[in-house]
Amino acid sequence: MDCNRNCYCKCVICNSISTDSHTSPRFNMVSEMAETNFKLKYWGNQAEDYILPSTYLGREYLVFGKLLISLSKWRAKGLLDFDVYIRPTGVGTLTNVINEQYYSGLQDKYDLTLYVKAKTEYYPLIWIDITGSSWTEEQSKERYGESVYAILSTKVEVAKQNEVMGRVWFIHYSDAEDKLKCISALQILNLEKQGKIKKDKFERDAVSYYYLIPLQYWKNLTDLRVSLKGFYQSFKEYLARGGK
């Protein structure tokens, strides 16, 4: 097809520039298809999950965004040599048993799940639960004698029951100080055995037990990245043994 190349507007057929209007029926058809595809892609009905931002989304989605950025940076810098996929998965606190029959697995019991892809399937590497506080570290110190972050003990017990202590991580976000810290369920259980942390209980409609974990035992996200690499290596060995 001929196209005048002395032009200023982009031609979708020959990828050139033209001031002339195209009168070819074929060009008109391609133009209409391009316009239709554009509308479908950007304005068409989408069959995806929808989130309406509100104050009730809480720190889970704030940490979700921060994790997306960290995972992307680690991949770009070569600190991770494989792709990690992330999904919001949790359906609510485990102390609420009203909908307990709908908990289908670990992905329902924690807020986020990190996956690795093999062929066309996705496999969970790490489950993440988000916690946090609006207190400053100084306010926490005034209350407990030292600065602590709290973890709902039920979440740790679920990891123990499913024998995935090292693969369940908790991320604490400080609303007051904009800090991210993490710790694994395995690390929490080891600290408890060593007598370095204790439980406390809070009573409202029901009693909830929390681990009170001093800040010195919390890790930076670097530890989460190292854990990801370790479990990915284990996953590759699992596949090599014919696990899938």
UniProtKB/Swiss-Prot annotation:
Q: Which Pfam families match?
A: VirArc_Nuclease (PF12187)
InterPro entries linked to this entry: D212_cat_dom (IPR022012), D212_cat_dom_sf (IPR043115)
- Domain of life of the organism encoding this protein: Viruses
Protein name per UniProt: Uncharacterized protein D-244
Q: Give the source lineage, highest ranks first.
A: Viruses, Viruses incertae sedis, Fuselloviridae, Alphafusellovirus
